[in-house]
Every structure is written in C-alpha cells, then in structure tokens.
Amino acid sequence: MAETSLLEAGASAASTAAALENLQVEASCSVCLEYLKEPVIIECGHNFCKACITRWWEDLERDFPCPVCRKTSRYRSLRPNRQLGSMVEIAKQLQAVKRKIRDESLCPQHHEALSLFCYEDQEAVCLICAISHTHRAHTVVPLDDATQEYKEKLQKCLEPLEQKLQEITRCKSSEEKKPGELKRLVESRRQQILREFEELHRRLDEEQQVLLSRLEEEEQDILQRLRENAAHLGDKRRDLAHLAAEVEGKCLQSGFEMLKDVKSTLEKNIPRKFGGSLSRICPRDHKALLGLVKEINRCEKVKTMEVTSVSIELEKNFSNFPRQYFALRKILKQLIADVTLDPETAHPNLVLSEDRKSVKFVETRLRDLPDTPRRFTFYPCVLATEGFTSGRHYWEVEVGDKTHWAVGVCRDSVSRKGELTPLPETGYWRVRLWNGDKYAATTTPFTPLHIKVKPKRVGIFLDYEAGTLSFYNVTDRSHIYTFTDTFTEKLWPLFYPGIRAGRKNAAPLTIRPPTDWE
C-alpha cells in the first residue's frame, strides 16, 4: 500500500513537471531558445524576442518570413505582446521555485526524491534510505501521510492560538474604542463642570446684586442722615452765633440796662453762679430776678448740649468678609444633607447610637428585632432615614482608623434578605476599604484606588440628575472616585462598618457635619 502511494505521488509530480516544462517552451523564443525578451507578435501569430526577429529580418526589404512557419508578411509588423511578457516572468519564477524544490526534495546521499518520512529520526528519506540498514527497522510512511498527520497536530495547536488571537483582537478593538469613549466622558464631564459653574456664577451674580443693592440702600440711608444732621447743625450754629453776638452786646451795657431787658435774654448763656450775686447787684428786685435767673439757667443746655454725629460704619456683613466668600459658602451649605440612620433597616449585628449618627458591628446578634421587609438580614449594613430622587446632596462620614468599611448609596429595590454581591448591576454604588490598606470602587471588576493619604473622613456628593456619585478624601481634600450611571429609583445613603477582627475595626462609622463650611 505504501508502494502504491509512492507511485501515485510520483505520477502527480511528473504531471506537474510536464506542465511546467510546456510553459517554459511556450515562453521561449524559437530563434535564441531562451526566455522571450521584449516579446513581439508578427502577422502569423508567432512570438519572438524583439532583438531576435529584428536581426532575422535585418537584410530584408520585403516579404518577411516567419522563422517557424515560413509564412511571409509584406510589412515589417512587430506588435509588443505585454501579456506574454508577464507570463514569461511567471515562468522564470516557477523555474526558480522548481529548481529550489528539486534541490530540497532530493536525498543528498542517493539523489532520489524524498518521498518517505521516518518517525524515529523525524526526517524525510528516499526509497533507498528506507530499505537501507539505517532505517530498515524504523517506522516509515509516505511523506503525504506524515504531512497530513502533522498538519492535523498543528491544526490542534492552531485552535487555541486562534482563540487567543481572537481574544487579543477583541481586546485591541475594545482598547481602540476607549479613546473615543474617554473623549465622550471627558466632554460630558466638561459640560457638567461648565453647567455647574454657570449655575454657580448665576447664583453668585444674584447674591452680588442683592449685596450691592443692600450696600447702596445703606449708603443712601447714611447720606440722608448726614444731610439732615448737617442741616440741623447749620441751624444750631446760626442760633449760637446770634446768641453769642447778643451776649457780647449785653456785656458792654451797664448793669441797669442789662437787667432791664433780662426777659428777652432767656436763651442767653448765663452761668449758674450768677444767681448768687443778684442780691448784691439789685437788692430790691432780688425775688423777681431769681425767677428770671431760673429761666435763664434752663437755657444753659445750649452751652452743654453735645453735637451728635452720624456714624458711617457699615454693617458687619460688609466690613468683615469671612475666609470664604459668604455668598458661595451660603450656596454650598444648601447642599449639605442632614443624614441620620434608620434602625428599621439595620442588620441585627449592628448597633446605632442614640442620636442615630453612628453605627458599629457587634458579635452578638440582636434577637428582639422584628424581621421587617426593609431590614437587611445578610449584608450587615444600614440605610439613612431619608432617600433622594433628585437634586444635589453632600454628607461626610468619619471612618477614623478603621480597617474595614464601605460607604455609598443603594437603590430602593435592592435585595435585603438573601446572599448578594453589592455592585452597580445589583443597585449598589460603594467605595470600600479592607485589610487596612486596600481601597476599591466596587465596580465589575473592582477598580483599585491608589490613595496617597489615608482618609479619616470621607465626603460623598450625589448629583442625581447628572447621574454621578463622587467620593472625596476630606483629610487631604482630594478626589477619590466618581461613579457615572443613570439613576431611576430613590437612592439611600448606605453605611457598612465592617466586621470586627478582635479589637481591630471596633470603632463606629459616624456621620459628621462638614467642619469647614462656617
């Protein structure tokens, strides 16, 4: 059977060689017997090298015969045969390949075709080698059979390679899409930032207009009081000047003349001690003059009256600005959410503080708690009493030196009773710490977070309409991670204090008011 295969292989090779030889003949010039160079075709249809047929007809002026069929043509007609020229080049290449294959497929020892394959020596051998002493006891099969066998083995090796190639191709395709996705995400975040600051500018402009209007009103009020006070002081000045002139005139009169018109000087500036000397000046009219002096002394206030002035000190809101612009601070304070813990949702191993601001894990399960639909019975966490369906909200959680915790939000419809994996796909958006130093955003798969400064307090900012949940390290004022999603349900702040490991991680999670907003 092996000999039959060898004969069939030899017949196939002979047929191929004959076809190649025929092609070489057709691509050869009948004059020079070499491959055609610049082949041209004459009237009878035969092809020759342009140089060969030109030399053949060199001394002829008419009746140009064909070197092959002797048919004559009346004109020296030479048409280039470019298609044949291309075939000649192909024939040359095939001849080179044939020569190489022939050299490689011949036994270097016996110069016979290498038509068999020796399994023991893993090499191709000729028929003479197969029956020689060297390979006589070896397993020898036709080369085509061995080729097919090894081709199947290589095919099996190729399958995992192709699978890996497809995987890498998919990965490459995915990576090539990421710049576009990144561009879209960046543009979305850019538009969000622009909207945020546009809104911030609008609110600041409104606050600025309110404050400027208030400042202008206060300015006008103070100016009005200044004008009124100036007019009043002008009137007082004129009265005092007139009185001073009259007093000076009276001082120049004799005592009798001065006392004669004393009733007209009730508004004059007469010292109180003057009353004690009246008895010596005019003893007869002493009693009457005492009454007049009382009237005069009542007008002494003209001398002692203090002149009032209008203060131009502005209100404290305008004279002392706080460290942050209070208008901006006022806007930001509106975002702070008053978050308290809901005992109806707390896992039985969690204990809440009296003010419902702290939660910690205890080893002993509380048995007197009713198993309500809202209570978590597998995942040891607790939710807030208030959820959010719109708007922007910010709260802070003190994590201290805990080694295990998670904070974030969950949607209203999450499973609370059975075993679960808290991921965005199941309705949980969280950042967590475990083993004391491993931080991650609980995406699919987890996104490791490389945090330089260990946070003692974590800030959480929810923008429901924008579909973002951002986490911040309050300790060093750095951004930790932002989830981007589409929120369609009520979202509840979530707190997971982590299980205790001996004395480690015993501290509670505590909701704290932001301390840098005042």
Curated annotation (Swiss-Prot):
What residue stretches are annotated with the B30.2/SPRY domain?
319-514
What Pfam families does the record tag this protein with? Answer: PRY (PF13765), SPRY (PF00622), zf-B_box (PF00643), zf-C3HC4_4 (PF15227)
Q: What keywords are annotated for this sequence in UniProt?
A: Apoptosis, Coiled coil, Cytoplasm, Metal-binding, Mitochondrion, Nucleus, Transferase, Ubl conjugation, Ubl conjugation pathway, Zinc, Zinc-finger
Enzymatic class: transferase
| Reaction catalyzed | S-ubiquitinyl-[E2 ubiquitin-conjugating enzyme]-L-cysteine + [acceptor protein]-L-lysine = [E2 ubiquitin-conjugating enzyme]-L-cysteine + N(6)-ubiquitinyl-[acceptor protein]-L-lysine
Q: Which residues form a coiled coil?
A: 181-250
- Which GO terms fall under molecular function for this chain's record? identical protein binding; ubiquitin protein ligase activity; zinc ion binding
Q: Where in the cell is it found?
A: Cytoplasm, Cytosol; Mitochondrion; Nucleus
Q: How is it modified after translation?
A: Autoubiquitinated.
Give the pathway annotation: Protein modification; protein ubiquitination
Stated family: Belongs to the TRIM/RBCC family.
On assembly, the entry states:
Interacts with MOAP1. Interacts with CDKN1A.
Question: What function does this protein fulfil?
Answer: E3 ubiquitin-protein ligase. May facilitate apoptosis by inhibiting APC/C-Cdh1-mediated poly-ubiquitination and subsequent proteasome-mediated degradation of the pro-apoptotic protein MOAP1. Regulates the G1/S transition of the cell cycle and DNA damage-induced G2 arrest by stabilizing CDKN1A/p21. Positively regulates CDKN1A/p21 stability by competing with DTL for CDKN1A/p21 binding, therefore disrupting DCX(DTL) E3 ubiquitin ligase complex-mediated CDKN1A/p21 ubiquitination and degradation.
Q: What is this protein called?
A: E3 ubiquitin-protein ligase TRIM39
Gene symbol of the encoding locus: TRIM39
